[in-house]
Amino acid sequence: MFLSTYENKLDKKGRVSVPASFRSHLSNLGYNGIICYPSFNNASIEACSQDRIEKISSAIDSLNPFEEKRDFFATSILAESINLQFDSEGRISLSSKLLKHAKIKSSMLFVGQGQTFQIWEPTSFEKFKVTARKKANLNRANLKWEKHFNNNEGK
């Protein structure tokens, strides 16, 4: 699982080190890289495993092939996705297109989201985090704890 938030910087060759815990999780899943695509929810980069992007692709494929919303999702996610392999030191090279979308110049945050993670420009993420915490507080009753735990686990 991808947890926590880490800050790393681009090196002189435009590479960035993916946090060790994120690489370890991906390695445990049998992957030596990540899939990245520009978020259409905010100015960040979405990152996930090959398995996750295959699930997203299946969800898109389940839509009527003649409806334009299928094309919207396929274009916004699949056509924009890039498979990035880790080098020997756990680094990736994000494309200039991805960096521009997220407004990243040098520093970036790797933000764990459970089954996925996001890559943000630090100031943009701090602003988003304030809004996210407020909205999470307002919507906290929407988390249905009982659906996910049996036999009084997690109480």
Stretches found by the model and what they are:
Residues M1-E7, K12-R15, S21-L84, S88-E89, ...:
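Flexible "stalk/tail and boundary" regions
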